[in-house]
């Protein structure tokens, strides 16, 4: 007769805390593993999987009261023509620039916020 995983879990759930600690210690010795070691290695792997973001998008949420200044700033930042920059700004909420460095994104955000736009970096 084979014992199922559910039966093992049910038996463990009925044990006292001290008996569970003894069981863990016995399993560590029998299989040559350490419960604390696996926890640390899992945390290390999670840190490796999380990459630091290097490219950002500038998202125009709200134009603000100074539409002309926002259009001029967007035009100079994107290299678009006047009509294209105006159309882009008027389509807010929208992405203004994609895949730019963190420094460039923060600089553009500050410039646009200074002229009254509401900006989000994603």
UniProtKB/Swiss-Prot annotation:
InterPro entries, A to Z:
Ribosomal_bL12, Ribosomal_bL12_C, Ribosomal_bL12_C/ClpS-like, Ribosomal_bL12_oligo, Ribosomal_bL12_oligo_N_sf
Task: Give one Pfam family.
Answer: Ribosomal_L12_N
GO annotation terms (biological process):
translation
Its Gene Ontology cellular component terms are: cytosolic large ribosomal subunit
Please indicate if the UniProt record lists Ribosomal protein as a keyword. yes
List the GO molecular function terms. mRNA binding; structural constituent of ribosome
Keyword annotations of the record? Ribonucleoprotein, Ribosomal protein
UniProt function note: Forms part of the ribosomal stalk which helps the ribosome interact with GTP-bound translation factors. Is thus essential for accurate translation.
Question: Which family does the record assign?
Answer: Belongs to the bacterial ribosomal protein bL12 family.
Protein name listed in UniProt: Large ribosomal subunit protein bL12
